[in-house]
């Protein structure tokens, strides 16, 4: 799902000292998905989550072609992650979507 290229990352510290990176993976110039990886120091040894991609296009919806530009907030009080992203459907334009991950553990 990310064989063409990757980019557009956003990195956040985790309470246990590790770091998480949210990024865009492109299978081709028109199709993008969002993935995540964990690093012990935020610089090296990034390990992709086994659940990647974490956000993918959904047929016949606003994001049928691509999901990209992740913006992420860790809500410790609500014990969840909120991920806003741009979704594109080639025939209907571009919109903003929101994915909510319940729980603070991403792995």
Predicted regions and their residues:
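Carbohydrate-active catalytic/glycan-binding domains of CAZyme proteins
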Residues: 1-107
């Amino acid at each position: 799902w990310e064989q063409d290229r990757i980019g557009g990352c956003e990195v956040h510290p985790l309470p246990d000292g590790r770091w998480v990176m949210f990024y865009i993976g492109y299978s081709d110039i028109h199709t993008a998905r969002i993935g995540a990886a964990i690093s012990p120091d935020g610089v090296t040894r990034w390990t992709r989550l086994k659940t990647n991609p974490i956000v993918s296009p959904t047929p016949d919806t606003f994001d049928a072609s691509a999901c990209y530009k992740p913006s992420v907030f860790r809500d410790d009080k609500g014990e969840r992650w909120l991920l806003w992203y741009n979704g594109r459907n080639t025939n209907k334009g571009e919109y903003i979507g929101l994915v909510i991950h319940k729980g603070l553990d991403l792995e």
